[in-house]
């Protein structure tokens, strides 16, 4: 993997900097590095493809070295270099796609394609110019079974989940009380509602709670907490739990009371915030518990009182809600990230070349299914293909 990264970094620099008119002295170190790459690769043959619709291609390396000059690089010099650069880039692209297409239930962190296995050999260790990539560093740690430390801006750690729970219900569905939520990516929205606006509740207060277990622990998280759940702020028709009917939800939004958010790790509370909105910090957690209340307003203008009568029919439904967004966090497992294209790159390659469903990844790289059942085997393979995708993205956009 280090060799693949070094090759890609060298080729990217060569493509960007070896241009007509450039002073040789400004790129002499890069050209020496480029020549070292050619010397090491010359005389070797590789094969890529042969899985799904990814065609088999054979690669032979027999290229001349780039020479020295006292002046600027001329058109002939650059054209000669371009021929070599484009061949190498095409090779790297195909090695990456071949690797992305493959998976293994055992030791999925290790190279799976024939070409990358060959590049991992001792004879190519001389191609090791720059391994400063975060993904390379973490791939090495994962490969040695050390703790990795991925920093994500918005980690897609929450499988998609959208449902409701009714704490009070009738066959007519005309006086309901409960919670509804949607969890996805890095955001939780939860709403508590009561058709009667807590009229018959103790002290006219309804208590709601929403617990969200994560598939992996997060540390040093920056989180936004808002006293609203905008996805549940408009009328909708909802299928009943048994699927036999539908019921009408027509929310009127109140501000939640006594809001508390707890961040737990292995069942122990690590951080607690009460009635604090905006930006909050969570140190270390694998579970989020949100609790809040709907309080019937003790004083109401006639217009508000008409919204919340003391007896049916209840046309409008009192609703309170919360939104919690994980803006950034550190995770010791590789995850899809809203700010990166790695999952999209991997999925696109596998779809474009009709890669058959293997023993590890779900069909279509379905992220909800993948993260819901996030096994060590999936984590290893995802670490490898994301690393390769990050390398490929240096050359192929």
From Swiss-Prot:
Binding site for Zn(2+): 153
Entry's Gene Ontology BP terms: fusion of virus membrane with host plasma membrane
GO MF assignments: host cell surface receptor binding; metal ion binding; structural molecule activity
Alphabetized Gene3D superfamilies for the sequence: 2.60.120.170, Viral capsid alpha domain (1.10.1350.10)
Ranges for region Interaction with the inner capsid protein VP2: 62-73
Major localisation: virion
Binding site for Ca(2+): 266, 286
Subcellular location: Virion
Keywords: Calcium, Capsid protein, Intermediate capsid protein, Metal-binding, Ubl conjugation, Virion, Zinc
SUPFAM superfamilies the record matches: A virus capsid protein alpha-helical domain (SSF48345), Viral protein domain (SSF49818)
Pfam families (alphabetical): Rota_Capsid_VP6
GO CC terms in record: viral envelope; viral intermediate capsid
Modification(s) after translation: The N-terminus is blocked. Sumoylated with SUMO1 and SUMO2. Sumoylation of viral proteins seems to have a positive role on viral replication.
InterPro entries: Capsid_hemagglutn (IPR008980), Rotavirus_A/C_VP6 (IPR001385), Virus_capsid_a-hlx_vir (IPR008935)
Biological role: Intermediate capsid protein that self assembles to form an icosahedral capsid with a T=13 symmetry, which consists of 230 trimers of VP6, with channels at each of its five-fold vertices. This capsid constitutes the middle concentric layer of the viral mature particle. The innermost VP2 capsid and the intermediate VP6 capsid remain intact following cell entry to protect the dsRNA from degradation and to prevent unfavorable antiviral responses in the host cell during all the replication cycle of the virus.
Family the UniProt entry places it in: Belongs to the rotavirus VP6 family.
Other remarks in the entry: The VP6 trimer contains a zinc ion located at the center of the molecule. The zinc ion is not essential for either trimerization or transcription activity of the DLP. Zinc-depleted VP6 has an increased sensitivity to proteases.
Quaternary structure annotation from Swiss-Prot or TrEMBL: Homotrimer. Interacts with the inner capsid protein VP2. Interacts with the outer capsid glycoprotein VP7. Interacts with the outer capsid protein VP5*.
Protein name: Intermediate capsid protein VP6
Lineage: Viruses, Riboviria, Orthornavirae, Duplornaviricota, Resentoviricetes
